[in-house]
Amino acid sequence: MSDLLNAAALDQLFRTARTQNAFLDTPVSEDLLRELYDLVKWGPTAANGSPARFVFVTTAEGKEKLKPALSEGNAAKTLAAPVTAIIGFDEDFHEKLPYLFPHADAKSWFDGPRTARTESAFRNSSLQGAYLILAARALGLDAGPMSGFDNAKVDAAFFAGTPIKSNFLVNLGYGDPAGLFPRLPRLSFDEAARIA
C-alpha cells in the first residue's frame, strides 16, 4: 500500500492547479523536460504499449512550424509559452511490444491493418498526455492543454513520413496568474458518478 499524499501535494496536483493561458518569460530547461518524461513513462498503458510520442517545441523555428496549425484563439498563448508539447501516438507502437511486454506475444494482438491499432494508440496516448500534465505539476510547472489546432498540419510539419499522428497539445512553463480566468465549477459526484 502506498502512503497517502499530503493535502499540499493533492492541492498542487488537483485542487488548486489551474489551466494556464499565459506564462512568465522563464525558460524550461531540457534537463527538466527529460525529468518530466522520466516520470511520464511510468504511467500505466494497455499491455505496457506506451504509444505516445512527444515533441517538445521550444525554439522559435519550432514555434513557426507550429503556428499555421493553431486555431486563432490558441495562437498567441502557444507562441508565447516556453514549451508546447505535442502529444502524438505511434500507430505502429506494437513493434516495440516484444521489448515492452515480453511475457506474452502482445505484438500479435495488434498485427494487421494499422487502422485496427489506432483506437488503442489514441486512447493510451491520451492517458500518457494526462500523466504529462500531472507530472509537470508535480515538478512545479504549469500546463495548458488544448485541442484547438489542425491535426493534419501538425502531422505534416512534425511527423511526416512516420506512423505518428498528433493527439493534443499542452503548453508548459511557469504560469502568469494575470492570465487566469475565474475558477470554473466542476460536477459533483452525484452529477458525474454512481456506484453500481
Swiss-Prot record:
Q: What is its EC number?
A: 1.-.-.-
What HAMAP family does the record tag this protein with?
Oxidoreductase_RutE_HadB
Checking SUPFAM superfamilies in the record gives: FMN-dependent nitroreductase-like (SSF55469)
The protein in question is named Putative NADH dehydrogenase/NAD(P)H nitroreductase XCC3605
Q: Does the keyword Transferase apply?
A: no
Which keywords annotate this record?
Flavoprotein, FMN, NAD, NADP, Oxidoreductase
Which CDD domains does the entry mention?
RutE-like (cd02148)
Which ranges form a coiled coil? none
What family is it from?
A: Belongs to the nitroreductase family. HadB/RutE subfamily.
- GO molecular function list: oxidoreductase activity
Instruction: Read off the Pfam families from this record.
Output: Nitroreductase
The protein's superkingdom reads Bacteria
Q: Is NAD given among the entry's keywords?
A: yes
The top EC class is oxidoreductase
Question: What does UniProt list as this organism's lineage?
Answer: Bacteria, Pseudomonadati, Pseudomonadota, Gammaproteobacteria, Lysobacterales
| Cofactor(s) for this UniProt protein | FMN
